[in-house]
Amino acid sequence: MANPLYHKHIISINDLSRDDLELVLATAAGLKANPQPELLKHKVIASCFFEASTRTRLSFETSMHRLGASVVGFADGSNTSLGKKGETLADTISVISTYVDAIVMRHPQEGARMASEFSGNVPVLNAGDGNQHPTQTLLDLFTIQETQGRLSNLSIAMVGDLKYGRTVHSLTQALAKFEGNRFYFIAPDALAMPAYILKMLEEKGIEYSSHGSIEEVVPELDILYMTRVQKERLDPSEYANVKAQFVLAADLAGAANLKVLHPLPRIDEIATDVDKTPHAYYFQQAGNGIFARSALALVVNADLAL
């Protein structure tokens, strides 16, 4: 059948149906098992990062090189015509689109406007905006499937900054496309999961609950998804309290299949001795970004009969 994602913008995880997600994940698994170094040969990809990034930018650029594509772009938007001369974002991206076959972009502006405001005919892949991080979600899903053998009938806890953490918003929306998943949200009141995410779960009849500590739910979990509590969002006294409340230690009493994930960077929320436990999987998770982002770049650039 024709590739449904060819030349499609991927701005939000909601741009992808369950079938689309399964297509990207199957492609990622194939690339991990059998690397294909020339699938995007002669393609040129723009890497446009208007915000700081380490893992996302480097894994995207590595992914492109491993598929045979050339990469152009920048890691500091302040040195572009947009930053120096006042050019609009729409004009900047419209011009770049005439040079390349696809654009990977991180920008604080929410992605729907980011894609719709430029006149170009190449796909835009959102590498993180003010609300969504779809490619992080793809590597998270790939990692969950790799460790659990499925994406349905899972018990998933999300811990830390659930209000501003774009990774947990996208991941919850994606996992809600698969049946039987159950969510546990663990966060201070000031950083609780946004109401629109909870409403979405309720409308779909998906079970969730809120909790004040990690320990009370660990025995139930397949996936424990940690995030950092962002110091800049809280009063100093409140931060000191919640920081100690949401620290994962190596003595967690989880099931044998439990995996601890984290979008990184971690600060203090996962003790370093957790790294040596069989539950820790966040560094492998980061490595899976190569395969998930390679797969996404491939399916939007190659009109394959998949």
From Swiss-Prot:
Belongs to the aspartate/ornithine carbamoyltransferase superfamily. ATCase family. One of its GO terms (biological process) is amino acid metabolic process. SUPFAM superfamilies: Aspartate/ornithine carbamoyltransferase. It holds the Pfam family OTCace. This is Aspartate carbamoyltransferase catalytic subunit. Pathway: Pyrimidine metabolism; UMP biosynthesis via de novo pathway; (S)-dihydroorotate from bicarbonate: step 2/3. It comes from Serratia marcescens. Carbamoyl phosphate binds at residues 55-56, 106, 133, 136, 264-265. Catalyzes the condensation of carbamoyl phosphate and aspartate to form carbamoyl aspartate and inorganic phosphate, the committed step in the de novo pyrimidine nucleotide biosynthesis pathway. Keywords: Pyrimidine biosynthesis, Transferase. One of its GO terms (molecular function) is amino acid binding. It catalyses: carbamoyl phosphate + L-aspartate = N-carbamoyl-L-aspartate + phosphate + H(+).
